[in-house]
Amino acid sequence: MGKLVIISGPSGSGKTTICKLLEKDPLVKKSISMTTRLPRHSEKNGKAYHFVSTNDFEEMIQKGELAEHAEYCGSYYGTPMNALREALEKEIIYLLEIEVQGALQIMEKFPEAISIFLLPPDKKT
C-alpha cells in the first residue's frame, strides 16, 4: 500500500527544493496537479501540470472528481482523486506539493496522509 505525503507551506519555504531531493528516491513519485491557467512557453502538458479548460475543471468539481482544489490568481488548481487512489494501490510514496487549503482538503479525505508544513527561516525569505 502506498503513502500520501503532503508538502505545504508559503512561497519561499523550500517546498520545491525538498520535493526535488525526495524525488531522487525511486520509490517516490510526485503528483502532477491540474490547472486552468495557460501553460508557460517552456511547459508541456503532463510534466509540471495537466492543463485543462475552466469548464472541464468546474465539471470535475461538480462530479467530486478532485481530491482538492483551490483558486489562485484567477485560475483553478487541483489534484484528481483517481491519481491518489491509484498511487495508494502501489508501493510508492506519492508527494503532493500543494498549498495549505489543498492540504486540509486532502487530510479530510485521506486522514492517513502525512502532512509536512514548511516555514521559511525568516520573514525576508
Regions found by a protein language model. Name each.
Residues 16:
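Walker A/P-loop
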Residues 23-32:
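Post-Walker A helix-loop "phosphate-sensing" segment adjacent to the P-loop in P-loop NTPases
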Residues 7:
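Hydrophobic anchor at the beta1->P-loop junction of P-loop NTPases
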Residues 35-94, 100-104:
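ATP-dependent small-molecule kinase phosphotransfer cores
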Residues 19-20:
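The feature captures the helix immediately C-terminal to the Walker
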Residues 13:
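ATP-binding Walker
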Residues 10:
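P-loop (Walker A) phosphate-binding loop of NTP-binding proteins
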Residues 94-99, 109-125:
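Conserved phosphate-donor/acceptor-positioning beta-strand/loop module used by diverse small-molecule
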